[in-house]
């Protein structure tokens, strides 16, 4: 049983390798890019809309609602980044029904790259919202003594994001593989459905955690209503 798609080598020349992680990652990006282009090329504002547009609107609305529930004031500002994270991880899991496909999220290099994107996005949105001085000030609050601890916190939660997604995806694939080996004719459909569900849950958790980190950096939470204030 393979523990990682990194072990599947399609081409190698010296220290250069083309493994399944790279191939399927770029394949997923191509599918998402081409798919989004095809779906959005004929958008309509009228009553008559295509099934693909209806599906797209449902997905976008659901993602916006989740971003808003985290507390970010303007979900549209973060929709592109957070929506892409969710769709990439979710699509990587949904494609496991294709024979021969290996999800790139089963590789630590992929999950680390996704976590690094979040690591870069947090200060990007924080500086954009508060300015450089306002964002850096958050590292020395409530006192300058907290500076090293806040820096360690930023790095550790990035590592936690990468390891959490990798561990959950790999362990889920291993458990399903073991069960299918033991009972190959009884549980294949059930185990496949369970794997898809696990992947969707991990995509949701990863994107929500990214939204929470961005909300903390931007302080872009909705203000709480004062007592007696009308909603």
Swiss-Prot record:
Disulfide bonds: none
GO biological process, one term: proton motive force-driven plasma membrane ATP synthesis
CDD domains: ATP-synt_Fo_a_6 (cd00310)
Any one cellular-component term (Gene Ontology): proton-transporting ATP synthase complex
PROSITE patterns linked to this entry: ATPASE_A (PS00449)
Residues passing through the membrane, by range: 14-34, 78-98, 107-127, 174-194, 196-216
GO MF annotations, alphabetized: proton-transporting ATP synthase activity, rotational mechanism
Subcellular location: Cell inner membrane
Topology of this chain in the membrane: Multi-pass membrane protein
Alphabetically ordered keywords of this record: ATP synthesis, Cell inner membrane, Cell membrane, CF(0), Hydrogen ion transport, Ion transport, Membrane, Transmembrane, Transmembrane helix, Transport
Family matches, as PANTHER family: ATP SYNTHASE SUBUNIT A, CHLOROPLASTIC
Subunit (UniProt): F-type ATPases have 2 components, CF(1) - the catalytic core - and CF(0) - the membrane proton channel. CF(1) has five subunits: alpha(3), beta(3), gamma(1), delta(1), epsilon(1). CF(0) has three main subunits: a(1), b(2) and c(9-12). The alpha and beta chains form an alternating ring which encloses part of the gamma chain. CF(1) is attached to CF(0) by a central stalk formed by the gamma and epsilon chains, while a peripheral stalk is formed by the delta and b chains.
HAMAP family membership: ATP_synth_a_bact (MF_01393)
Entry function: Key component of the proton channel; it plays a direct role in the translocation of protons across the membrane.
NCBIfam families: altF1_A (TIGR03306), ATP_synt_6_or_A (TIGR01131), PRK05815.2-3 (NF004481)
Family classification: Belongs to the ATPase A chain family.
Protein name, per record: ATP synthase subunit a
Organism this protein belongs to: Albidiferax ferrireducens (strain ATCC BAA-621 / DSM 15236 / T118)
């Amino acid at each position: 049983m393979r523990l990682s798609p990194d072990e599947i080598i399609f081409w190698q020349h010296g220290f250069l390798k083309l493994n399944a992680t790279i191939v399927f990652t770029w394949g997923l990006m191509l599918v998402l890019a081409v798919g989004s282009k095809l779906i959005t090329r004929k958008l309509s504002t009228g009553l008559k809309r295509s099934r693909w547009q209806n599906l797209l609107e449902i997905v976008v609305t659901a993602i916006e609602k989740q971003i808003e529930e985290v507390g970010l004031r303007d979900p549209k500002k973060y929709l592109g980044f957070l929506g892409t994270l969710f769709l990439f991880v979710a699509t990587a899991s949904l494609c496991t029904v294709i024979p021969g496909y290996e999800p790139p999220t089963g590789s630590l290099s992929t999950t680390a790259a996704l976590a690094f994107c979040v690591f870069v996005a947090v200060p990007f949105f924080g500086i954009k919202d508060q300015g450089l001085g306002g964002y850096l000030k958050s590292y020395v609050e409530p006192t300058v003594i907290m500076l090293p601890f806040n820096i360690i916190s930023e790095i550790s939660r990035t590592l936690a994001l990468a390891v959490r997604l990798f561990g959950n995806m790999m362990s889920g694939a291993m458990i399903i593989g073991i069960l299918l080996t033991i009972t190959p004719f009884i549980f294949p459909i059930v185990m496949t459905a369970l794997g898809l569900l696990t992947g969707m849950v991990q995509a949701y958790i990863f994107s929500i955690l990214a939204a929470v980190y961005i909300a903390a950096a931007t302080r872009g939470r909705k203000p709480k209503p004062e007592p007696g204030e009308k909603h």
